[in-house]
Protein backbone atom coordinates (compact mmCIF):
# COMPACT_ATOMS: atom_id res chain seq x y z
CA UNK A 1 0.00 0.00 0.00
CA UNK A 2 2.82 2.39 0.89
CA UNK A 3 4.60 1.51 -2.36
CA UNK A 4 1.45 2.29 -4.37
CA UNK A 5 1.02 5.61 -2.57
CA UNK A 6 4.62 6.59 -3.26
CA UNK A 7 4.28 5.56 -6.91
CA UNK A 8 1.13 7.67 -7.26
CA UNK A 9 3.16 10.70 -6.22
CA UNK A 10 6.55 9.96 -7.77
CA UNK A 11 5.46 8.66 -11.18
CA UNK A 12 3.61 11.83 -12.30
CA UNK A 13 6.32 13.98 -10.72
CA UNK A 14 9.22 12.12 -12.35
CA UNK A 15 7.46 12.02 -15.72
CA UNK A 16 6.77 15.75 -15.55
CA UNK A 17 10.36 16.61 -14.63
CA UNK A 18 12.38 14.06 -16.62
CA UNK A 19 9.93 13.03 -19.36
CA UNK A 20 11.42 9.52 -19.56
CA UNK A 21 11.08 7.35 -22.64
CA UNK A 22 9.85 3.89 -21.68
CA UNK A 23 9.94 1.02 -24.17
CA UNK A 24 8.79 -2.59 -23.87
CA UNK A 25 6.73 -2.36 -20.68
CA UNK A 26 4.59 -5.16 -22.09
CA UNK A 27 7.58 -7.49 -21.66
CA UNK A 28 7.29 -7.29 -17.86
CA UNK A 29 4.88 -10.00 -16.60
CA UNK A 30 2.09 -8.45 -14.55
CA UNK A 31 2.09 -11.33 -12.06
CA UNK A 32 4.41 -14.08 -10.88
CA UNK A 33 8.05 -14.14 -9.92
CA UNK A 34 10.40 -12.34 -12.28
CA UNK A 35 13.94 -10.93 -12.30
CA UNK A 36 14.64 -7.55 -13.87
CA UNK A 37 18.32 -7.60 -14.83
CA UNK A 38 19.75 -4.20 -15.70
CA UNK A 39 22.94 -2.37 -16.52
CA UNK A 40 24.04 -0.10 -13.68
CA UNK A 41 25.18 3.49 -14.24
CA UNK A 42 23.82 5.52 -11.33
CA UNK A 43 22.50 5.54 -7.78
CA UNK A 44 19.18 6.60 -9.30
CA UNK A 45 18.78 3.32 -11.25
CA UNK A 46 16.96 1.60 -8.39
CA UNK A 47 14.31 4.33 -8.55
CA UNK A 48 14.10 4.58 -12.34
CA UNK A 49 13.22 0.92 -12.86
CA UNK A 50 10.38 0.62 -10.30
CA UNK A 51 8.86 3.88 -11.53
CA UNK A 52 8.88 2.57 -15.12
CA UNK A 53 7.35 -0.84 -14.45
CA UNK A 54 3.66 -1.76 -14.16
CA UNK A 55 4.24 -3.52 -10.80
CA UNK A 56 6.25 -3.16 -7.57
CA UNK A 57 9.93 -4.10 -7.77
CA UNK A 58 12.23 -4.94 -4.86
CA UNK A 59 15.93 -4.06 -4.85
CA UNK A 60 18.84 -4.50 -2.49
CA UNK A 61 20.25 -1.35 -0.92
CA UNK A 62 23.20 -0.67 1.36
CA UNK A 63 22.19 -0.94 5.01
CA UNK A 64 23.73 2.53 5.50
CA UNK A 65 20.69 4.02 3.75
CA UNK A 66 18.47 2.74 6.57
CA UNK A 67 20.55 3.91 9.54
CA UNK A 68 20.98 7.67 9.01
CA UNK A 69 20.06 10.07 11.79
CA UNK A 70 18.06 13.27 11.81
CA UNK A 71 15.38 14.42 9.40
CA UNK A 72 17.46 13.55 6.34
CA UNK A 73 18.15 10.04 7.60
CA UNK A 74 14.49 9.48 8.43
CA UNK A 75 13.39 10.70 4.99
CA UNK A 76 15.91 8.50 3.19
CA UNK A 77 14.98 5.47 5.28
CA UNK A 78 11.27 6.02 4.63
CA UNK A 79 11.82 6.53 0.91
CA UNK A 80 13.91 3.38 0.46
CA UNK A 81 11.47 1.34 2.51
CA UNK A 82 8.49 2.65 0.55
CA UNK A 83 10.23 1.82 -2.74
CA UNK A 84 10.66 -1.79 -1.67
CA UNK A 85 14.40 -1.69 -0.97
CA UNK A 86 15.86 -4.51 1.13
CA UNK A 87 18.84 -3.57 3.34
CA UNK A 88 22.04 -5.60 3.03
CA UNK A 89 25.37 -5.16 4.81
CA UNK A 90 27.98 -5.15 2.04
CA UNK A 91 30.78 -5.48 4.58
CA UNK A 92 29.47 -8.77 5.90
CA UNK A 93 31.44 -11.87 4.94
CA UNK A 94 28.17 -13.52 3.98
CA UNK A 95 26.76 -10.48 2.12
CA UNK A 96 26.68 -12.16 -1.30
CA UNK A 97 24.71 -15.18 -0.10
CA UNK A 98 22.41 -13.03 2.02
CA UNK A 99 21.66 -10.94 -1.06
CA UNK A 100 20.80 -14.01 -3.12
CA UNK A 101 18.65 -15.41 -0.31
CA UNK A 102 16.72 -12.13 -0.07
CA UNK A 103 16.11 -12.10 -3.81
CA UNK A 104 15.10 -15.76 -3.84
CA UNK A 105 12.53 -15.17 -1.12
CA UNK A 106 10.93 -12.35 -3.12
CA UNK A 107 10.68 -14.15 -6.45
CA UNK A 108 9.54 -17.45 -4.94
CA UNK A 109 6.70 -15.49 -3.33
CA UNK A 110 5.70 -14.22 -6.77
CA UNK A 111 7.37 -10.81 -6.60
CA UNK A 112 9.59 -8.87 -8.98
CA UNK A 113 13.23 -8.34 -8.06
CA UNK A 114 15.70 -5.97 -9.68
CA UNK A 115 19.31 -7.07 -10.00
CA UNK A 116 22.51 -5.67 -11.49
CA UNK A 117 24.58 -8.58 -12.85
CA UNK A 118 27.64 -6.31 -13.20
CA UNK A 119 27.72 -6.12 -9.41
CA UNK A 120 28.42 -2.40 -9.14
CA UNK A 121 28.06 0.80 -11.13
CA UNK A 122 30.08 1.31 -14.30
CA UNK A 123 32.31 4.37 -14.02
CA UNK A 124 33.48 4.38 -17.65
CA UNK A 125 30.18 3.60 -19.39
CA UNK A 126 31.18 0.15 -20.59
CA UNK A 127 29.03 -2.91 -19.90
CA UNK A 128 30.95 -5.32 -17.69
CA UNK A 129 30.74 -9.10 -17.61
CA UNK A 130 27.78 -10.40 -15.66
CA UNK A 131 28.14 -12.42 -12.48
CA UNK A 132 26.14 -15.63 -12.44
CA UNK A 133 23.94 -14.89 -9.43
CA UNK A 134 21.17 -13.76 -11.77
CA UNK A 135 21.19 -17.14 -13.52
CA UNK A 136 21.35 -19.05 -10.25
CA UNK A 137 18.23 -17.24 -9.08
CA UNK A 138 16.35 -17.79 -12.34
CA UNK A 139 17.17 -21.51 -12.40
CA UNK A 140 16.57 -22.02 -8.68
CA UNK A 141 13.16 -20.30 -8.65
CA UNK A 142 12.23 -21.16 -12.25
CA UNK A 143 11.37 -17.56 -13.15
CA UNK A 144 12.07 -15.53 -16.30
CA UNK A 145 14.67 -12.81 -16.57
CA UNK A 146 13.62 -9.55 -18.24
CA UNK A 147 16.67 -7.63 -19.51
CA UNK A 148 16.54 -3.90 -18.79
CA UNK A 149 18.53 -1.19 -20.54
CA UNK A 150 18.98 2.15 -18.79
CA UNK A 151 20.21 5.07 -20.87
CA UNK A 152 20.97 8.49 -19.41
CA UNK A 153 20.61 7.80 -15.69
CA UNK A 154 24.33 8.51 -15.26
CA UNK A 155 23.58 12.11 -16.23
CA UNK A 156 20.96 12.50 -13.49
CA UNK A 157 23.20 11.39 -10.66
CA UNK A 158 26.72 10.35 -11.69
CA UNK A 159 28.95 8.38 -9.34
CA UNK A 160 30.04 10.82 -6.63
CA UNK A 161 27.26 13.38 -7.17
CA UNK A 162 25.17 14.25 -4.12
CA UNK A 163 22.20 15.89 -5.85
CA UNK A 164 20.18 14.78 -8.90
CA UNK A 165 20.15 16.81 -12.11
CA UNK A 166 17.65 17.17 -14.95
CA UNK A 167 18.49 14.87 -17.87
CA UNK A 168 16.77 12.70 -20.46
CA UNK A 169 16.31 9.06 -19.48
CA UNK A 170 15.31 5.99 -21.46
CA UNK A 171 14.23 2.70 -19.88
CA UNK A 172 13.98 -0.30 -22.20
CA UNK A 173 12.55 -3.69 -21.26
CA UNK A 174 13.58 -6.61 -23.47
CA UNK A 175 11.84 -9.91 -24.06
CA UNK A 176 11.90 -12.37 -21.14
CA UNK A 177 14.61 -15.03 -21.12
CA UNK A 178 13.33 -18.32 -19.70
CA UNK A 179 15.54 -20.73 -17.72
CA UNK A 180 13.98 -23.84 -19.25
CA UNK A 181 16.14 -23.42 -22.35
CA UNK A 182 19.30 -23.97 -20.27
CA UNK A 183 18.40 -26.97 -18.14
CA UNK A 184 19.95 -29.47 -20.57
CA UNK A 185 23.38 -28.01 -19.77
CA UNK A 186 25.58 -28.88 -16.77
CA UNK A 187 24.77 -26.55 -13.87
CA UNK A 188 27.87 -24.38 -14.15
CA UNK A 189 27.60 -24.01 -17.91
CA UNK A 190 23.88 -23.28 -17.64
CA UNK A 191 24.53 -20.42 -15.22
CA UNK A 192 27.32 -18.99 -17.35
CA UNK A 193 25.41 -19.24 -20.65
CA UNK A 194 22.20 -17.80 -19.23
CA UNK A 195 24.12 -14.92 -17.67
CA UNK A 196 25.99 -14.21 -20.92
CA UNK A 197 22.72 -14.21 -22.87
CA UNK A 198 21.17 -11.78 -20.38
CA UNK A 199 24.15 -9.44 -20.71
CA UNK A 200 24.02 -9.67 -24.51
CA UNK A 201 20.34 -8.71 -24.39
CA UNK A 202 21.13 -5.74 -22.13
CA UNK A 203 23.91 -4.65 -24.49
CA UNK A 204 21.50 -4.80 -27.43
CA UNK A 205 19.16 -2.46 -25.54
CA UNK A 206 21.78 0.07 -24.44
CA UNK A 207 24.41 -0.07 -27.17
CA UNK A 208 27.17 -0.01 -24.54
CA UNK A 209 30.66 -1.20 -25.37
CA UNK A 210 31.24 -4.62 -23.77
CA UNK A 211 34.17 -4.53 -21.34
CA UNK A 212 34.78 -8.27 -21.51
CA UNK A 213 35.90 -8.35 -17.86
CA UNK A 214 34.31 -8.13 -14.43
CA UNK A 215 33.87 -4.75 -12.78
CA UNK A 216 36.18 -4.93 -9.77
CA UNK A 217 36.06 -1.20 -8.94
CA UNK A 218 33.89 -0.21 -5.98
CA UNK A 219 31.46 2.64 -6.72
CA UNK A 220 30.95 3.62 -3.08
Task: Annotate the PLM regions.
Residues 2, 97-220:
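Non-catalytic C-terminal accessory region of glycerolipid acyltransferases
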Residues 15, 30-93:
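Catalytic core of membrane glycerolipid acyltransferases/transacylases, capturing the structured
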Residues 24, 39, 61-62, 84, ...:
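A secondary-structure boundary/capping signal
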Residues 20-25, 44-46, 72-73, 100-102, ...:
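A generic local structural motif
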Residues 15-22, 95-97, 153-155:
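Short gly/ser/thr-rich secondary-structure transition/capping motifs
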Residues 13-15, 79-80, 106, 138:
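A generic structural signal for well-ordered alpha-helical segments
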Residues 3, 9-40:
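Helix-to-loop junction immediately C-terminal to a conserved catalytic motif
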Amino acid sequence: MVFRAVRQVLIPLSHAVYRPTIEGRENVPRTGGVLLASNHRSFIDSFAIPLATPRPVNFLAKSDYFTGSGLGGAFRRSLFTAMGAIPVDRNSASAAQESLDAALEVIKAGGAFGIYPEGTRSRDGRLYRGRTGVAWLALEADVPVVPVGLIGTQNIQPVGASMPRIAEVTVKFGRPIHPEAYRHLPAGKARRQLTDDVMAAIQALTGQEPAGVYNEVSSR
